[in-house]
């Protein structure tokens, strides 16, 4: 049976795993890295995803897209998005209330939905798994922050569909990490585990009870879908922009490339400060030829981010009170996400739990993908001893309800209810002889619906005339295992019924949109493949030219006539000039040039080799001599 994979689709990095032969394999990408940057870059010639995209970001900041997870499932006027736009070098535009990303690609202006960018990252993860498994992959479990709302979950599912994946389940990141922890540690008895998951862009806290390492029951969840390592980077970048202004009277924030180089250096410095008390930043010619050398201490970094670090404790308190537990009843505190390596974050959490030691035993970058891979295996019916008894019980992160008279939020499903779940309540009309009711569905914790998030609405009409309060309208909320909601309303007297899956029409892609994006994704994939083939053909042609020219200076070349030497030299120079002037040529054009060059030069080189026979045979001129950027050649990384 084809393997099902688990994908941790992260804000800054993504990771993929598969469960086979009784264990989870975290799969390295084509660069040998077990996590892949969630970056997509568009240039005049090609589209790059992952490491290749992140490596060229300073050269092409306005067309390199990242942070799609901070856009997905949100509205353009969301204050969080408006604040983020100040930090992003790429352009975000308003398309009917939805945020879309605008880039220049192959000389044209293109607009992409966040789901499309995320789908490109998912495609990269899918291809990474396929290369490792040697077979095509269709089924996947994708993780989301526990605190993602309905529209963000739907949008993530859509991204999977655009990438050509059958998304078997959307599961919560801390729940996946708990699965990794529980299975890895062979836990005995009943343990209350707190998962503290602080990643690149999101923050979750979940409390689970794990029984005998097989029953995983989420008791409560809390978090902030907009807090993570990138926010700490932003603070450091702002600090150095101010310092640069003070020292050199120049404003870095107006220069996208300089700002990107500074951000890359800050990200590196932040990592250094997790193991050292001081980090050095050295950037040559940062702006207007100024070399910028500076230092930052761990204490200074902690001061810059002190309010953000402290804010991680509020969701911990909220989760404890929702789970009706006190601090002393938590057995294990498990750290997940790269940002939990920050010493101050660890010490604040440890002090909150009165000095209790934190559990650092699982890999914070890989735990979520590990758990997702286990869940994928369970859902595809894998009967391996290690996982056959595992049962996962998750909860709804936010309360769900409808608006009743006066704009009041009447909850049907309370937050932290077990999912899947179903709740029914009876409502009635507000006025005499009211012919219909409008059912407006909201999620959130506030008493009034205006302060909560509208998910969708529908009308139930055809109610027989009756005094107010007499008709009985039965409203049923059905929340599935992905945390996605179905709502039904039924008038008991007439039997009229209406239901919807909350598709959040304002924020959600239509099926037609998804179909269009799937075909576009296929087109981009074909273009990428053609581009790779063209580059390989160009490298081969270039290598052939250089090999020929080398042969003219090599041993025995003096035996060639001057006319032959001149012919080879001129044809090689002419071909190299053609390559320089035709960087966008197709594979066939390069192959044609290769044939022409070979037709003229091969007979001359054969003469040379025959005359030189007896000496060591030179290497064949046709083989690729490790070009730059070809599949076999080295990839070149920009260094600050």
UniProtKB/Swiss-Prot annotation:
Keywords: ATP-binding, Nucleotide-binding, Stress response. Residues 608-640 are annotated as: Disordered. InterPro entries: ATPase_NBD, Heat_shock_70_CS, HSP70_C_sf, HSP70_peptide-bd_sf, Hsp_70_fam. It comes from the Eukaryota. GO terms for molecular function: ATP binding; ATP-dependent protein folding chaperone. The keyword Cytoplasm does not apply. CDD domains: ASKHA_NBD_HSP70_HSPA1. PANTHER family: HEAT SHOCK PROTEIN 70KDA (PTHR19375). Belongs to the heat shock protein 70 family. This is Heat shock protein 70 A1. It comes from Anopheles albimanus.
């Amino acid at each position: 049976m084809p393997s099902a994979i688990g994908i941790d689709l992260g804000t800054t990095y993504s990771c993929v795993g598969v469960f086979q032969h009784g264990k989870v394999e975290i799969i390295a990408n084509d660069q040998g890295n077990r996590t892949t940057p969630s970056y997509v870059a568009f240039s005049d010639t090609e589209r790059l995803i992952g490491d290749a995209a992140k490596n060229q970001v300073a050269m092409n900041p306005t067309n390199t897209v990242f942070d799609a997870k901070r856009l997905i499932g949100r509205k353009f006027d969301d204050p969080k998005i408006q604040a983020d736009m100040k930090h992003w070098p790429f352009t975000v535009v308003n398309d009917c209330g939805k945020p879309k990303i605008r880039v220049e690609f192959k000389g044209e202006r293109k607009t992409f939905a966040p789901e499309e960018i995320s789908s490109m990252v998912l495609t990269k993860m899918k291809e990474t798994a396929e290369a490792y498994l040697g077979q095509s992959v269709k089924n996947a479990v994708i993780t989301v922050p526990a605190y993602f709302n309905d529209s963000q979950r739907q949008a993530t599912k859509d991204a999977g569909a655009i990438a050509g994946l059958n998304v078997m389940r959307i599961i919560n990141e801390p729940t996946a990490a708990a699965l990794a922890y529980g299975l890895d540690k062979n836990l005995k008895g009943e343990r209350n585990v707190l998962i503290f998951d602080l990643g690149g862009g999101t923050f979750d806290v979940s409390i689970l009870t794990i029984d005998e390492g097989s029953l995983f029951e989420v008791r409560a969840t809390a978090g902030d879908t907009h807090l993570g390592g990138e926010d700490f980077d932003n603070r450091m970048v702002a600090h150095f922009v101010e310092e640069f202004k003070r020292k050199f009277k120049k404003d870095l924030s107006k220069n996208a490339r300089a700002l990107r180089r500074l951000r890359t250096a800050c990200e590196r410095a932040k990592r250094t400060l997790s193991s050292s008390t001081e980090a050095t930043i050295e950037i040559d010619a940062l702006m207007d030829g100024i070399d910028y050398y500076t230092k930052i201490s761990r204490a200074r970094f902690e001061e810059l981010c002190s309010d953000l670090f402290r804010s991680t404790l509020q969701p911990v308190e909220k989760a404890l009170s929702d789970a009706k537990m006190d601090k002393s009843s938590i057995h294990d505190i498990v750290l997940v996400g790269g940002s939990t390596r920050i010493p101050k974050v660890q010490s604040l959490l440890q002090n909150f739990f009165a000095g209790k030691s934190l559990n650092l035993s699982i890999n914070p970058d890989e735990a979520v993908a590990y758990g997702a891979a286990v869940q994928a295996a369970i859902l595809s019916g894998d009967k391996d001893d290690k996982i056959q008894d595992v049962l996962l019980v998750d909860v709804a992160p936010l309360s769900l309800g409808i608006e009743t008279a006066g704009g009041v939020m009447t909850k049907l499903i309370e937050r932290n209810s077990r999912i899947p779940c179903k709740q029914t309540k009876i409502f009635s009309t507000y006025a005499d002889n009211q012919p219909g009711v409008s059912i407006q569905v909201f999620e959130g914790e506030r008493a009034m619906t205006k302060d909560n998030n509208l998910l969708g609405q529908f009308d139930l009409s055809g109610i027989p005339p009756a005094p107010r309060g007499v008709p009985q309208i039965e409203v049923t909320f059905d929340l599935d295992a992905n945390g996605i909601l179905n709502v039904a309303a039924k008038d008991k007297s007439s039997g009229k019924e209406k239901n919807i899956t909350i598709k959040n029409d304002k924020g959600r892609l239509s099926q037609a949109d998804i179909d269009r994006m799937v075909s576009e994704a296929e087109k981009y994939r074909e273009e990428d493949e053609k581009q790779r083939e063209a580059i390989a053909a160009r490298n081969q042609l270039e290598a052939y030219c250089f090999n020929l020219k080398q042969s003219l200076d090599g041993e025995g070349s003096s035996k060639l006539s001057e006319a032959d030497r001149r012919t080879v030299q001129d044809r090689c120079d002419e071909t190299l000039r053609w390559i320089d002037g035709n960087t966008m040529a197709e594979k066939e054009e390069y192959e044609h040039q290769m044939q022409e060059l070979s037709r003229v030069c091969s007979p001359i080189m054969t003469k040379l080799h025959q005359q030189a026979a007896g000496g060591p045979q030179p290497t064949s001129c046709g083989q690729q001599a490790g070009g730059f950027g070809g599949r076999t050649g080295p990839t070149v990384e920009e260094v600050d």
